[in-house]
Amino acid sequence: LNFALFWIIFYCLLAVPIMENFGDSSVFTFLFLLLFAIIITGFIKKYKLTDKYGLDGFPKDPKRYLYFIPVWILATGNLWGGLSLSYSGLSQLWAVLSMILIAYIEEIIFRGFLFKALLTKEGVKNAIIIVGVTFGIGHIVNIFVGQANFDTLVQIIFAIAWGFILVTIFYKSKSLIPGIIGHGLINAFS
């Protein structure tokens, strides 16, 4: 559990000031997130933890894919009212790539590290609840990067709901890959 909490706190302490100073459409934010993703992936590979944390590929049982279809459809919800770009030029590219990296990192530290740590101590039901709520409340840091209070509150509520969905998919499928894709789509389309 301490290991998971370390990564969550470490990520927040580094990401918040970078996002606050540069925004999510900056090449500096993208490079920080890329470096963080490389470090966390390197750690997992070095200690041969890809299987434990669900990064060794898609589930082997094709029936498990049925869980992903509704999630990936819902993940496109931000597009249902039409596509509107938030930035122009390279700023849009950096923002989209940053959002995908944020999804990758958050899936590993919340669904991978935290859920796996809680699973043995708290059991499935409690671990799912704790991770879902923790993930949602974790979005409160967006207040510190300039997001409006009401928008952050709405984001927290949606993040709690998505947190439950994504951790349940990870538990059922034993793979973080579908959650990374779904979370990445949600972030990229927001």
Give residue spans per PLM region.
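Juxtamembrane "helix-exit" motif on the non-cytosolic side of transmembrane helices
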Residues: 12-21, 77-87, 140-146
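Alpha-helical transmembrane segments in multi-pass membrane proteins
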Residues: 1-45, 64, 68-69, 93-94
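Juxtamembrane helix-entry segments on the extracytoplasmic side of multipass membrane proteins
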Residues: 86-96, 145-158
